[in-house]
């Protein structure tokens, strides 16, 4: 999977700004392709065609003369593709060039060598003609697919932002009330480790939020705006810099999660609280190095419009460390599963139940560590499988923040239990407040009635200061709000400590 998200954004930009094919359906040696004067399209397309033309001329000079018998068509460069010597009456074919995203490199271009040993000439122009119609025959389908992926990205990242912000709010709320118990008795035996785990979660959730916001801005502001890309303002490249930085931070905080879990489970289950500042340096600080190096080299060596092109190996400055982080997390996952299966075997559980737990642990850890991008690295070449691959991979990319928020916050039993306890405490305080208010109103009414009776019988004022009457035996004593809160907090602390 080579720069999947970046390449898709480039393809979508081409389609949204030019839904019709970029190149005409034919080519010949005397024809020079015409491109609209958009620097981004012109530079990329012409540069790749010139490189292919130089390779073709070198090849024609190095190949030996035609060794066959009979008439043949001479080797030639038709403007887009290189053709070898071809016997008369043969339809030569090769794969379509990949100069432009709307050309399908999986389709084929054909060129017919006539019986007279001359390349076929188009009847209208009377010049040699190559059939490139299949190269862009499926452009409307690709355009429709690009629009679907475009809206899938908008919906996925918007939903991820919403759920992640709610999750961060829940973590902040539970942290404020000090209610969040350890997530798992095996993985997190102490309260401090639980707090460290939540801190890692919050940082990773924050990278998801910031990355999704930047991607939405990029898709809404940059991708559909061909005029903006043509002007190539500095803010365009600044946005690209932060996009690459937040993407790197996202994957390196996944690596932080993997390092933390691996240290906790494999190295020492009963380890003391780890130093979190190392994780902050790795998650927030280290991605600045490859991102800054990429920005400098890109500005000097490959300064294309808005840095949208993927036709440069400079992207490996960023994607190389990201790929390394994913591979490391993949091995962490395998080692963690090995330890978990070993512990399940030692507990003498049923074999089916043991493997069910192992599978469940795998499914939970996969989105956290991002190893799905290691398992699905290459796109199939067939159209149907390629389309299925696109939808699966882009769903995982755009909805990953949503999946992580659901699994590690909303579906977490400890988070649910803490929220229920806080809700029950709130209900108890509210109910006690209502009872106290009703009791105060009743006491005020009784005092008013006693005062009216005293005025009627002319009782001295000091008699109103007599001792309060005893409560009837069948009536419950009024409980103050403060008492209820103290008792509830004591019970809650006992449950938490247990």
Swiss-Prot record:
PROSITE patterns according to UniProt: G_PROTEIN_RECEP_F2_1 (PS00649), G_PROTEIN_RECEP_F2_2 (PS00650), G_PROTEIN_RECEP_F2_3 (PS50227), G_PROTEIN_RECEP_F2_4 (PS50261)
Q: Does the keyword Cell membrane apply?
A: yes
Task: List where the protein spans the membrane.
Answer: 148-170, 199-219, 237-259, 277-297, 314-337, 358-376, 385-411
Which segments does the topology annotation call Cytoplasmic? 171-198, 260-276, 338-357, 412-498
Under the heading Gene3D superfamilies, the entry gives: GPCR, family 2, extracellular hormone receptor domain, Rhodopsin 7-helix transmembrane proteins
The cross-references to InterPro entries, in alphabetical order and at most eight, read:
GPCR_2 (IPR050332), GPCR_2-like_7TM (IPR017981), GPCR_2_calcitonin_rcpt (IPR001688), GPCR_2_calcitonin_rcpt_fam (IPR003287), GPCR_2_extracell_dom_sf (IPR036445), GPCR_2_extracellular_dom (IPR001879), GPCR_2_secretin-like (IPR000832), GPCR_2_secretin-like_CS (IPR017983)
One of this protein's GO BP terms?
A: negative regulation of ossification
Query: Which ranges does the record list as Extracellular topological domains?
Result: 30-147, 220-236, 298-313, 377-384
Which Cys pairs does UniProt list as disulfide-bonded? 56-82, 73-113, 96-135, 236-306
Entry's Gene Ontology molecular function annotations? amylin receptor activity; amyloid-beta binding; calcitonin binding; calcitonin gene-related peptide receptor activity; calcitonin receptor activity
Q: Which SMART domains match?
A: HormR
List, alphabetically, the Pfam families matched: 7tm_2, HRM
The membrane topology term of the UniProt record is: Multi-pass membrane protein
Give the range the annotation lists for the signal sequence: 1-29
Where can this protein be found?
A: Cell membrane
Where would you say this protein principally sits, based on its record?
membrane
**Keyword annotations:** Cell membrane, Disulfide bond, G-protein coupled receptor, Glycoprotein, Membrane, Receptor, Signal, Transducer, Transmembrane, Transmembrane helix
Subunit text: Heterodimer of CALCR and RAMP1, RAMP2 or RAMP3; the receptor complexes function as AMYR1, AMYR2 and AMYR3 receptors, respectively, and respond to amylin/IAPP, calcitonin/CT and CGRP1 ligands. Interacts with GPRASP2.
Q: State the family named in the UniProt similarity comment for this chain.
A: Belongs to the G-protein coupled receptor 2 family.
Please state what the protein is called: Calcitonin receptor
Q: Gene that codes for this?
A: CALCR
């Amino acid at each position: 999977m080579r720069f999947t998200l970046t390449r898709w954004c480039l393809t979508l930009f081409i389609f949204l700004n030019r839904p019709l094919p970029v190149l005409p359906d034919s080519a010949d040696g005397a024809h020079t392709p015409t491109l609209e004067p958009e620097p981004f399209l012109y530079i990329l397309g012409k540069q790749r065609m010139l490189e292919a033309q130089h390779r073709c001329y070198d090849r024609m000079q190095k190949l030996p003369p035609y060794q066959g018998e009979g008439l043949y068509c001479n080797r030639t460069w038709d403007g887009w593709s290189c053709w070898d010597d071809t016997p008369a009456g043969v339809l030569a074919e090769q794969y379509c060039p990949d100069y432009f995203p709307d050309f399908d490199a999986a389709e084929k271009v054909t060129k017919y060598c006539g019986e007279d040993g001359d390349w076929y000439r188009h009847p209208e122009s009377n010049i040699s003609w190559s059939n490139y119609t299949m190269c862009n025959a499926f452009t409307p389908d690709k355009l429709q697919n690009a629009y679907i992926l475009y809206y899938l990205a908008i919906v996925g990242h918007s939903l991820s932002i919403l759920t992640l912000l709610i999750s961060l709010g829940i973590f902040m709320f539970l942290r404020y009330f000090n209610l969040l118990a350890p997530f798992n008795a095996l993985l997190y035996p102490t309260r401090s480790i639980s707090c460290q785990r939540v801190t890692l979660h919050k940082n990773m959730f924050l990278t998801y939020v910031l990355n999704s916001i930047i991607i939405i801005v990029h898709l809404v502001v940059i991708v559909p705006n061909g005029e903006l890309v043509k002007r190539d303002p500095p803010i365009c490249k600044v946005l690209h810099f932060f996009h690459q930085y937040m993407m790197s931070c996202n994957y390196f905080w996944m690596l932080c999660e993997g390092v933390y879990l691996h240290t906790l489970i494999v190295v020492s289950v009963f380890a003391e609280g780890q130093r979190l500042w190392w994780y902050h340096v790795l998650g927030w600080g280290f991605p600045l190095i490859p991102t800054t190096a990429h920005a400098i080299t890109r500005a000097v060596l490959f300064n294309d419009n808005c840095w949208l092109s993927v036709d440069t190996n400079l992207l490996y400055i960023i994607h190389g460390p990201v790929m390394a982080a994913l591979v490391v997390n993949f091995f962490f996952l395998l080692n963690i599963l090995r330890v978990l299966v070993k512990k399940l075997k030692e507990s003498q559980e049923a074999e089916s139940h043991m493997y069910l737990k192992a599978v469940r642990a795998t499914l939970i850890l996969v989105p956290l560590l991002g190893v799905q991008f290691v398992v699905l690295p290459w796109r199939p070449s067939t159209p149907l499988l390629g389309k299925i691959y696109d939808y699966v991979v882009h769903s995982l990319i755009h909805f990953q923040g949503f999946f992580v928020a659901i699994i590690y916050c909303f579906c977490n039993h400890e988070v649910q239990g803490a929220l229920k306890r806080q809700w029950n405490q709130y209900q108890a305080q509210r109910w006690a407040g209502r009872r106290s208010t009703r009791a105060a109103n009743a006491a005020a009414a009784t005092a008013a009635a006693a005062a009216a009776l005293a005025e009627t019988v002319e009782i001295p004022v000091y008699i109103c200061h007599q001792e309060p009457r005893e409560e009837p035996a069948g009536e419950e004593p009024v409980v103050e709000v403060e008492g209820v809160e103290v008792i509830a907090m004591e019970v809650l602390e006992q449950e938490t400590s247990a």
